[in-house]
């Protein structure tokens, strides 16, 4: 049995640390690297380190530990996670976290299934504040798993320093928010308010009447502040300078019956109440994913909404009003 599998070691520093600080002998180390320059750097540490460039070659091997930083392109990092879980007793990888907030793709479901009764901790952090020049559209995670683990999963937010415990990855938040009691209770309230209708009911192809032309994408997740996962415009339906009154026939829009309803909808979309609903699921710049809109309540479009009037209409308790106002950044005047 090999002792250590490393995903990605561009300068050979991980291999050097494993040998000098952890006592691994070079013969017990396998490094996946497909860049000849990186392979050369590793060989300068020791020519007895095994290097592979084909992930499939690992299927016949077994390791005590798998560590590293796999390729991030699309869901390729999950292929590496799955392979690591299949061939290693213990896994500790740094990679994108988007898969933790959703469960739509088969590879995401497979990764979570393999992590069941193995994952020990999930650490979320802003990779843009750690890796210079990076532009990650989502927080990074350090995913740690053991050969077998039956205890609660530790959920660590480096952005705030807070820790939580969940029993299963299905209990993970669905967006860039922390599962404290107040936030969870507000999310539950929004889910109750959107059982029969939501703002997504208005979204789609232009139907021929009045409309609000929100942009297809809005907000930025690239932020250098380690205390934030996104910029202040991330949880918005449109920018301050967006042209929402000019139709783009090939783009989705919000369809309403008349211009008064359109103006009412815009006043509502600007409120922190509506933007909190968007924040429950939004983890990318896309503004029209049905999942993102599914928990944004749809009020009557017969008036101009204000921050106070929408909270009063839905009878939001004062403590929850204060929480929503503090969680959603100021953006519109």
Ranges and model annotations:
Residues 1-202:
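Signature of N6-adenine DNA methyltransferases within the class I
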Residues 129-323, 328:
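C-terminal substrate-recognition regions of SAM-dependent nucleic acid methyltransferases
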């Amino acid at each position: 049995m090999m002792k250590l599998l490393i995903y990605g070691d561009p300068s050979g520093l991980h291999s050097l640390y494993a040998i000098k600080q952890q006592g691994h002998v070079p013969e017990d180390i396998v490094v996946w690297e497909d860049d000849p320059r990186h392979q050369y750097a590793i060989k300068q540490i020791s020519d007895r380190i095994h290097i592979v460039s084909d992930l499939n070659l690992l299927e016949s091997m077994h390791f005590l530990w798998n560590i590293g930083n796999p390729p991030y392109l699309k869901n390729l990092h999950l292929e590496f996670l799955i392979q690591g879980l299949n061939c290693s007793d213990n896994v500790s990888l740094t990679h994108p976290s988007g898969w933790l907030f959703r469960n739509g793709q088969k590879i995401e479901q497979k990764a979570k299934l393999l992590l069941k009764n193995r994952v020990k901790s999930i650490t979320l952090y802003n990779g843009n504040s750690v890796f210079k020049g990076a532009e990650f559209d989502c927080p990074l995670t350090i995913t740690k798993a053991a050969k077998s683990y039956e205890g609660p999963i530790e959920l660590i937010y480096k952005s705030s320093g807070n820790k939580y415990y969940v029993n299963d990855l299905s209990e993970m938040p669905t967006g860039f928010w922390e599962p404290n009691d107040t936030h969870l209770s507000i999310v539950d309230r929004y889910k109750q308010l959107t059982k029969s209708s939501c703002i997504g009911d208005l979204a789609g192809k232009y139907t021929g009447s009045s409309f609000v032309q929100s942009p297809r994408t809005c907000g930025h997740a690239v932020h250098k502040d380690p205390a934030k996962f996104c910029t202040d415009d991330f949880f918005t339906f449109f920018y301050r300078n967006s042209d929402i009154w000019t139709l783009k026939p090939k783009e989705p829009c919000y369809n309403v019956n008349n211009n008064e309803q359109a103006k009412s909808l815009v006043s509502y979309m600007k409120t922190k109440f509506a933007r909190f609903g968007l924040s429950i699921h939004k983890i990318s710049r896309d503004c029209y994913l049905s999942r993102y809109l599914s928990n944004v309540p749809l009020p009557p479009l017969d008036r101009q909404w204000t921050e106070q009037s929408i909270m009063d209409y839905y009878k939001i308790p004062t403590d929850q009003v204060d929480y929503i106002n503090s969680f959603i950044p100021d953006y519109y005047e």
